């Protein structure tokens, strides 16, 4: 399985998981889908869209259509739900701002992952869906948006390093410095993806790091048995983390024709 296939697999199962939790709990996806009182009682419809979209991403003949639907649907989360809420909340300092915009960034990264999978699927198809949504420029925009999200991830690791450290398994030493290191990794990845310098290497390392978050942080939480009042949150966090890792692998797959280091043609926007 290549990098792009791994991204599609992880993203698809992540979407199915988020949707399944919404269906079981009959609610929206908590802070990742802050609908509030705008459209009550439609959580299961949202969950069904995510489940079907995730399933479609895994099926060869349907993956382009499914990726398009998820790009639009997650785009609504980002721009219709998260952005207005984050702007209205504001923030008096960078710590408050990073916390306010974290949900926006996580949804933006997942939207970027869906968009990247759409563009990559369309490149393999003889009949282009919409060139302006799937050409090299669109792929570059999706990659840049993922980079912006990574900057927010990094800022939140520093702003809430104490909380981040507690999420790291206790058997891993120096958890607080590790929270800083992973935060720096997010920021460096964001800068690389936005600038196009060392983008393939950065995206791949980001994907590895996010995959380790799934394995070392979120899976053990589930295995340990989440508290009943936190069950929906813990399961949703697991599948969001899986979707984010899948998005990172998809972004890395979109850079497969670029060199790993410096040199001619190394810039992702070249």
Regions found by a protein language model. Give the residues of each.
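Extended, low-polarity transmembrane helix blocks
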Residues: 1-27, 31, 41-52, 58-159, ...
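Short juxtamembrane and helix-loop transition motifs at transmembrane-helix boundaries
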Residues: 25-37, 160-173
């Amino acid at each position: 399985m290549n990098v792009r296939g791994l991204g599609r697999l992880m993203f698809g199962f992540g979407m199915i998981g988020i949707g399944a939790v919404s269906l079981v709990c009959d609610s929206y996806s908590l802070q990742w889908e802050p609908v509030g009182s705008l459209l009550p009682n439609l959580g299961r419809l949202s969950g069904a869209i995510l489940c079907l979209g995730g399933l479609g991403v895994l099926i060869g003949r349907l993956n382009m259509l499914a990726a398009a639907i998820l790009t639009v649907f997650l785009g609504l989360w980002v721009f219709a739900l998260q952005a207005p809420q984050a702007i209205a909340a504001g923030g008096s300092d960078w710590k408050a701002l990073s916390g306010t915009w974290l949900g926006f960034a996580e949804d933006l990264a997942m939207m970027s992952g869906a968009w990247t999978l759409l563009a990559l699927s369309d490149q393999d198809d003889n009949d282009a869906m919409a060139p302006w949504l799937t050409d090299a420029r669109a792929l570059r925009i999706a990659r840049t948006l993922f980079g912006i999200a990574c900057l927010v991830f990094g800022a939140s690791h520093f702003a809430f390093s104490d909380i981040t450290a507690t999420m790291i398994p206790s058997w891993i030493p120096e958890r607080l410095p590790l929270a800083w290191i992973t935060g720096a990794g997010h920021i460096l990845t964001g800068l690389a993806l936005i600038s196009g310098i060392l983008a393939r290497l950065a995206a791949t390392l980001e994907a590895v790091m996010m995959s380790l978050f799934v394995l070392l942080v979120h899976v053990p939480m589930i295995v340990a048995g989440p508290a009943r009042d936190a069950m929906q949150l813990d399961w949703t966090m697991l599948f969001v983390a899986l979707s984010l890792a899948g998005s990172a692998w998809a972004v890395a797959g979109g850079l497969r024709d670029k060199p790993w280091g410096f040199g001619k043609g190394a810039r992702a926007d070249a």
